[in-house]
């Protein structure tokens, strides 16, 4: 008992006739006496290993009639349970020797613009011209096609297009055009809604400015709140329908809308007159009437095949016609100025005054700067409601 356990068991392990009846602890894998679970957990590498070869070679009837213990005992059929050390597979050969007989490395593909230039940008004309090349046609026709197509690479465009679309389908649609086609209406709708909301605030802003003229120095208030049906204090620009001042508010809004409509009409007339789309006959000096008709001395008739008459004719009492060319621009403006000058003689003095102001340009500019500096804040508060109309006017000016 005092001797080391390993020494006593080593002698016992040399006796190959000692059987292992029930298969417990085969090859001493779980025997704690041989320090299998302490210093050397893996029994395959334990120096005190004592194999029992006869335990792995159990014959029929070796342990009694009709009784054969399970091979490997309680640990199963694995090689480790049988005390056999399994080795890992050998390392593969290096890549230098493997590539001599194995798969070759994939070469670098050339860029798409060199191999398929027709695929860079869809163009029907260039695409059909590129199909005349046999190398390009090989991408769309099967390899086993007829030899006549290869020998005659210039078939009709209709048959070629139909054959291509029957195999490959319709060409891919340009997503950039689709995106721009969808976003453009949305952006226009957003701009229209924004301008509409701003335009609807113009009558309210002008109404506030209009009513503020009646309450100089005092906060504005609706006078209808002191009537027999008392209403809570409110501004004259936000009267409820039950307030007596509601009808006056609606009247002011209606007048403001008419004023805005008149302003838009004046802008449209100015735009058409600038484009030369108002062929108005000018007045002769000293005359107040004009009449259009066929001209005897002009090269183009007043009512000919041209879109607009290029000259106007006045018919005095003697029967002779006097032809006057219509200005290509500002014809209506010149007509109004001549008509006003014929009736108001003092306007001629205004022309001289304007010319004098133009001659004194530094002084005029300083005067304008001073006026803007002095009245600028008030003008900005008055003109700020009309700022949303400016983009509309600019768009109409550029489109017509």
Curated annotation (Swiss-Prot):
Systematic vaccination of individuals at risk of exposure to the virus has been the main method of controlling the morbidity and mortality associated with hepatitis B. The first hepatitis B vaccine was manufactured by the purification and inactivation of HBsAg obtained from the plasma of chronic hepatitis B virus carriers. The vaccine is now produced by recombinant DNA techniques and expression of the S isoform in yeast cells. The pre-S region do not seem to induce strong enough antigenic response. Residues 2-174 are annotated as: Pre-S. Residues 120-174 are annotated as: Pre-S2. Glycans are attached at residue 320. Residues 79-88 have a biased composition (Polar residues). Residues 2-119 are annotated as: Pre-S1. A lipid is attached at residue 2 (N-myristoyl glycine). InterPro entries: HBV_HBSAG (IPR000349). GO terms for biological process: caveolin-mediated endocytosis of virus by host cell; fusion of virus membrane with host endosome membrane; virion attachment to host cell. The large envelope protein is synthesized with the pre-S region at the cytosolic side of the endoplasmic reticulum and, hence will be within the virion after budding. Therefore the pre-S region is not N-glycosylated. Later a post-translational translocation of N-terminal pre-S and TM1 domains occur in about 50% of proteins at the virion surface. These molecules change their topology by an unknown mechanism, resulting in exposure of pre-S region at virion surface. Belongs to the orthohepadnavirus major surface antigen family. The large envelope protein exists in two topological conformations, one which is termed 'external' or Le-HBsAg and the other 'internal' or Li-HBsAg. In its external conformation the protein attaches the virus to cell receptors and thereby initiating infection. This interaction determines the species specificity and liver tropism. This attachment induces virion internalization predominantly through caveolin-mediated endocytosis. The large envelope protein also assures fusion between virion membrane and endosomal membrane. This is Large envelope protein. It comes from Hepatitis B virus genotype H (isolate United States/LAS2523/2002).
């Amino acid at each position: 008992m005092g001797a080391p356990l390993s020494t006593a068991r080593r002698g016992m392990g040399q006796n190959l006739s000692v059987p292992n009846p029930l298969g417990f602890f085969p090859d001493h894998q779980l025997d704690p006496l041989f320090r299998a679970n302490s210093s050397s957990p893996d029994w395959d590498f334990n120096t005190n290993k004592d194999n029992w070869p006869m335990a792995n070679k159990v014959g029929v009837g070796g342990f009694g009639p009709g009784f054969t213990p399970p091979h490997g005992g309680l640990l199963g059929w694995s090689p480790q349970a049988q005390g056999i050390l399994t080795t890992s597979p050998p390392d593969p050969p290096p890549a230098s020797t493997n590539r001599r007989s194995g798969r070759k490395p994939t070469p670098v593909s050339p860029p798409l613009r060199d191999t398929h230039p027709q695929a860079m940008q869809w163009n029907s004309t260039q695409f059909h011209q590129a199909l005349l090349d046999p190398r390009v046609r090989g991408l769309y026709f099967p390899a086993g096609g007829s030899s006549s197509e290869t020998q005659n690479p210039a078939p009709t465009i209709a048959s070629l297009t139909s054959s291509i679309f029957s195999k490959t389908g319709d060409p891919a649609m340009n997503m950039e055009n689709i995106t721009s086609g969808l976003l453009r209406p949305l952006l226009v709708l957003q701009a229209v809604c924004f301008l509409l909301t701003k335009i609807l605030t113009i009558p309210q802003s002008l109404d506030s400015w209009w009513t503020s003229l009646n309450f100089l120095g005092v906060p504005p208030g609706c006078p209808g709140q002191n009537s027999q049906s008392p209403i809570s204090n409110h501004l004259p620009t936000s009267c409820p329908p039950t307030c007596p001042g509601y009808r006056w508010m609606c009247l002011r809004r209606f007048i403001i809308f008419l004023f805005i409509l008149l302003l838009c009409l004046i802008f449209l007339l100015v735009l058409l007159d600038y484009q030369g789309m108002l062929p108005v006959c000018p007045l002769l000096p000293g005359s107040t009437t004009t009449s259009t008709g066929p001209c005897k001395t002009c090269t183009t008739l007043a009512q000919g095949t041209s879109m607009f008459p290029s000259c106007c004719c006045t018919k005095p009492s003697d029967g002779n016609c006097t032809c006057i060319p219509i200005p290509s621009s500002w014809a209506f403006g010149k007509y109004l100025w001549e008509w006003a000058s014929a009736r108001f003689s003092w306007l001629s003095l205004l022309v001289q005054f304007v010319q004098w102001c133009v001659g004194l340009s530094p002084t005029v500019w300083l005067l304008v700067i001073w006026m803007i500096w002095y009245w600028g804040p008030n003008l900005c508060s008055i003109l700020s409601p009309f700022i949303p109309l400016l983009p509309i006017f600019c768009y109409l000016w550029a489109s017509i």
